[in-house]
Amino acid sequence: MENRWQVQVVWMIDRMRLRTWTSLVKHHIFTTKCCKDWKYRHHYETDTPKRAGEIHIPLTERSKLVVLHYWGLACGERPWHLGHGIGLEWRQGKYSTQIDPETADQLIHTRYFTCFAAGAVRQAILGERILTFCHFQSGHRQVGTLQFLAFRKVVESQDKQPKGPRRPLPSVTKLTEDRWNKHRTTTGRRENHTLSGC
């Protein structure tokens, strides 16, 4: 019998970032209870030796999002990756498909974490106090309409905003972002053109 290969999309991340994100998820599952429906499975409860753990996030009665932690993979592009990564699956019954981090954040935001109420834009236009506030900004992928951006500015300018959780909410996009390859911008002093040869 021939070998059968299975290809999966895995986002390579460093070990410390994965530990920080996992502890943040555990904090919101067990302490703040805002993610109490989420299930954390340890590495010894999984059926694959490369899997370091799983987080099951129910979205509806039949569908769920699963964040799979992998270890012992081939080293990534950078030396600090050290063979750690995550995979994202959307499951409904026996069907499963892989999704990207932005879509995962949107799916999480449709079910969990408070957002603006439907009548909040009308309240802002009328000058009334807005009582709701979005605590999970990474769940909104697009830039948004001009009306929505103006509405957010009105909400930010209010002197009292509803308090969210003290620790940030677990965002899959933040977990998988590539901080190391971003250009660093210096703030403050401009560089001396005579010294840099420009």
Curated annotation (Swiss-Prot):
The modification Phosphoserine is found at residue 171. Highly phosphorylated on serine and threonine residues. Thr-97 and Ser-171 are phosphorylated by the mitogen activated kinase MAP4K1. It is found in: Host cytoplasm; Host cell membrane; Virion. A motif (BC-box-like motif) lies at residues 145-154. Residues 177-178 are annotated as: Membrane association. Its main location: host cell. This is Virion infectivity factor. The lineage of its organism: Viruses, Riboviria, Pararnavirae, Artverviricota, Revtraviricetes.
